[in-house]
Every structure is written in C-alpha cells, then in structure tokens.
Amino acid sequence: MRHTFTTEIMPLPTPEEKNINRLRKSFWEAVEEFDLIEPGDKIMVCLSGGKDSYTMLDMFIHAQTVRKNFEIIAVNLDQKQPDYPEHILPEYLTHLGVNFKIVEKDTYSIVIDKTPAGKTMCSLCSRLRRGSLYATAEELGVTKIALGHHREDVLETFFLNLFFSGKMEAMPAKYRTDDGKHVVIRPLVYCKENEIAEYSIYKKFPIIPCNLCGSQENMQRKITKKMLADWELQYPNRKEVIYNALKNISPSHLFDRDLYDFKELKHRVEELNEKDTPKVEEYIP
C-alpha cells in the first residue's frame, strides 16, 4: 500500500491564536477543577463592559460549542452614571445573538451621597451591585452567577486581606452565598490579566470605562497591584509561585484551630462553615 506524502507546510499559530488558546486552556482548567459548568445550568454572565467580563462572555460562548447542555444570559447593571453610553452593550449583545438583560438601578446617586469626601467608593458600590445582581439572578431563575475576576484580582485580594484585614483569604472560584440561594463562580481565576488585555485589544471590544471609581487614585488595590508587578519584574514568575501556594496549604503549619486540631494532632474532617465576609475593596468587573 502506497502512502501519499505532502510537502505542504502548515502555518504556525499566530501570537493572537496562541493567546486565545492559553486563555481557553486556563478557562477550562478552572471549569474542570471546580465543576463550574454542569448539565442543565443556566448561568448569568455579569457584564460590565470591561475587558474581563467581555473575555468571560467570549469564553462561555465558545464553551457552548463544546458543551451544549447549558444556557447563558448576559446581565448588565446600568447604575445611571453620568454620560454612561447605555446603547453600547445592547447593540453589541444583539449583534452577537446572545440572550441578555439590562438592569437599570440608580446606585450611583447612593454611592455619591453616602461616601465621605476623600474615601474610595469601591466597597459600597460593590455591595450595592452585588445586591442588585443577586435579586436579578433570583428573578431569572439562574443556577449560577459568573463574575469576571482573573488571576491578578485573586492575588491582589489575598494581599489586601493579609495586610489590612488580618486574614489569609483570597477569592474562591466557586461559593454559595450566605442565604444559600445563589452559587457564584469565577471561571477566569486561572487567566492572566495581561493575556486578557491582549485578547481585548485583538477582539476590539467596545470598552466602557468606569468613571465612578476608575479615576480615584491611591487606592490600596492599585498600590498592591504595583507591588506585585514590581516583584514580577525583579523575580520573574513570582506571581505564579504565589498563586500555586494558594493551592498548596499546610494547615498544620499555621495557627487556625478550625483547620487543624493541635490537641489531637490531626486535620479537621468536619465540613467548615464558609465565612462569606466582605472582602477589602472587592468589586464586580
């Protein structure tokens, strides 16, 4: 039997294609490790108009070509900020053919009224948005709420809690809210921010800037972000090492008696109640 050979050279993947593949690999790694997508799911994809949430939506749209047994609905909260371009997302989502809902809620006025001069607005804004999104999730009957936090968000939150709250706590990839009504997932937790930024430029997403808090300088989150960036420059791959540490915990070498029984010298086997306490400057992108 004769074999047919070809001298045709297959083109190498472009940098953009390599980046897309890395993002999809990271997305699926989180999905598989934490069971973020299950048969019959109806997932509410929270869309702010920023690079992270646009990328998350794209990942879910692609995921539906692989798994066809779940639904998505994109939800945007219009907080009635001045000069907010409210036409952009409906036009974009209609063009994509994605099922969506725009929720109009004037949280902007509340944040402006309640935040003292010189203080950052992130915490209150986040709580108000979270409440509105949870109410919308209940109304729509979704099984999961998807948020677009990425790897750097997780690391920054870990150090913010460590430095300013005295807690070793980051952002879970999946958790249930205190009232037991909602499951929240973060499918981008393994995705790197710079890869998301590159993807956003490549896809030419119609980015909507946050004029409420984006102009606030000297926030602790920005300082922490710079600290991590400086570490990465001085010690390449430092962020990856720290991130891996979040998956490699030794309770017996810390001091939390809920995690380790120091009297009997054994790990706790009973399920711990999740402490879903507010995070330092946590936000929904």
From Swiss-Prot:
EC numbers: 2.8.1.-
The protein's enzyme class: transferase
Single biological process term from Gene Ontology: tRNA thio-modification
Catalysed reactions listed for this entry: cytidine(32) in tRNA + S-sulfanyl-L-cysteinyl-[cysteine desulfurase] + AH2 + ATP = 2-thiocytidine(32) in tRNA + L-cysteinyl-[cysteine desulfurase] + A + AMP + diphosphate + H(+)
A single GO molecular function term of this UniProt record: sulfurtransferase activity
Subcellular location: Cytoplasm
Subunit note: Homodimer.
PANTHER family for the chain: AMINOTRAN_5 DOMAIN-CONTAINING PROTEIN, SULFURTRANSFERASE-RELATED
Protein name: tRNA-cytidine(32) 2-sulfurtransferase
UniProt organism field: Cytophaga hutchinsonii (strain ATCC 33406 / DSM 1761 / CIP 103989 / NBRC 15051 / NCIMB 9469 / D465)
